[in-house]
Amino acid sequence: MEPAAGFLSPRPFPRAAVPSAPPAGPGPPANASPRSEPEVLAGPRAPDPPGRLITDPLSGRTYTKGRLLGKGGFARCYEATDTESGIAYAVKVIPQSRVAKPHQREKILNEIELHRDLQHRHIVRFSHHFEDADNIYIFLELCSRKSLAHIWKARHTLLEPEVRYYLRQILSGLKYLHQRGILHRDLKLGNFFITDNMELKVGDFGLAARLEPPEQRKKTICGTPNYVAPEVLLRQGHGPEADVWSLGCVMYTLLCGSPPFETADLKETYRCIKQVHYTLPASLSLPARQLLAAILRASPRDRPSIEQILRHDFFTKGYTPDRLPVSSCVTVPDLTPPNPARSLFAKVTKSLFGRKKNKNKNHSEDQDNVSCLAPVVSGQAPASLIETAAEDSSPRGTLASSGDGFEEGLTVATVVESALCALRNCVAFMPPAEQNPAPLAQPEPLVWVSKWVDYSNKFGFGYQLSSRRVAVLFNDGTHMALSANRKTVHYNPTSTKHFSFSMGSVPRALQPQLGILRYFASYMEQHLMKGGDLPSVEEAEVPAPPLLLQWVKTDQALLMLFSDGTVQVNFYGDHTKLILSGWEPLLVTFVARNRSACTYLASHLRQLGCSPDLRQRLRYALRLLRDQSPA
């Protein structure tokens, strides 16, 4: 932490009135980060915490001290409850021994004076403060779900819609601060607190300062190493642009799993920051990479303003959920963008097919409404998929789920856990071997993905099954498939709803999606080879063709999860493939570099081992599945 700008004479601690009403909304604890993020100027470890009861010596009001929420260089933060009103707070406890010197006390006064008058939905609310002979107590809004650092520690990476959700709130709070002439100077995951209803609040104003003209700015280096801007390290002063830089580091950390300039050595980290030396993973969407590249620029003048950031394609063309589920604190949420056309169509189809007809209901009125919504469905079919299919896109797609799972299949979580358990059991006990055991002589034909196209930067993920059925998992979570004979269209508005239409009777609201599906089919037919020599299976022989529930791309492979429990992993480098199917017993099909395919019983692999080539891919598949598991 940094001493307050300037040295003022010590003065008595002002005392704020104790509120008679609870603070608006739940609110945050103190500085708590899952990684070791030492502040550049930090004091020694705080002494032992105070007793269980905190008493205001002037008013006599008492508070029960609860659990520790977080700790920093100068203070600890606890949950505290007013014994009379029952209102819960986060109380920041600063030992008097830490503010014995005038400049130390001035620092705390500066924090209080900057924070106490801030009133904004995305700023931690300051309630009141007092002191006794042992400590200074600052009472703040309590955020029951801790900080974004805790979510990041549990999740490691977040989806782009989640990152947009949190960044919009951070930008809102930061814009308010800058408009009031306040610089935060320590924006990091541990200082973004999450309320009970999943709202974000910017907190911890221990390093905050008033904005000064460039020539009058203090040159002190302050902040957290991984998030410090290059001009701060070069002692050029701290302006609003340095907060924007820190925000870019936060965005990168949430999307990529680690800060952009993090190294094992602090000096090396600072060198990377000064030289703006970092990498942008290809797995990020193009707008995300463009925004990060715009923010993380060496010159403060070249960085975008908050308004420009909010107008960037990353925010304007990407889906931002209105609210995140609480489960997203620990596991990947199932996010489905709203689609007015789909919602109305689901309502109409339910009216037409899903229940008894109401004699008093005018069905033609609803049908007219559906036809009017055709332009709402996303976009026109691409003029040339060849030119755009290689564009980078979102690394993940998921079919919408109503919570009950696919009616005749499994949920994503069930598929992941079943495959994870079976594969872990196989790999863990597999003895060393140099070659594969004998494959099954006549394995049952299986349905697998023979071709695929990732066009999710605009439309969705297209694939062709070995049965010649072609399908698209659209970005809005809907799924549409074309039968092998190209005469029937299958539409899944959610994972629990399924409708079939003849080609000539597809509703107008679905025509744009059908157009995109047909373009995908045409492109794959004309430009892609079948991915392996496996026995084909006729679609008529498949009672319920599997539905793609989720796909995930990494820098090495593509993972696909299906409603019948099938798991397929395609490796980019050598075009090998791994398919897990059957389950009773589990079958492992390996498509080699020469496109030849062999199917093995997983139990045989466990007993006899397999070649290093196959073992390596089984282990990578296991790692991919672990990454998708909420456990």
Swiss-Prot record:
GO terms for molecular function: ATP binding; p53 binding; protein serine kinase activity; protein serine/threonine kinase activity. Residues 63-315 form the Protein kinase domain. Its EC number is 2.7.11.21. Belongs to the protein kinase superfamily. Ser/Thr protein kinase family. CDC5/Polo subfamily. The gene is Plk3. GO terms for cellular component: centrosome; chromatin; cytoplasm; Golgi stack; nucleolus; nucleus. The active site is at residue 186. Residues 448-526, 547-630 form the POLO box domain. It comes from the Eukaryota. It comes from Mus musculus (Mouse). Induction: Negatively regulated by TTP family members: TTP binds to the 3'-untranslated region (3'-UTR) of PLK3 mRNAs, contributing to the rapid degradation of transcripts. Residues 20-31 have a biased composition (Pro residues). It is an enzyme of class 2 (transferase). Pfam families: Pkinase, POLO_box. It catalyses: L-seryl-[protein] + ATP = O-phospho-L-seryl-[protein] + ADP + H(+); L-threonyl-[protein] + ATP = O-phospho-L-threonyl-[protein] + ADP + H(+). The lineage of its organism: Eukaryota, Metazoa, Chordata, Craniata, Vertebrata. This is Serine/threonine-protein kinase PLK3. Transmembrane segments: none annotated. Phosphorylated in an ATM-dependent manner following DNA damage. Phosphorylated as cells enter mitosis and dephosphorylated as cells exit mitosis. Residues 1-59 are annotated as: Disordered.
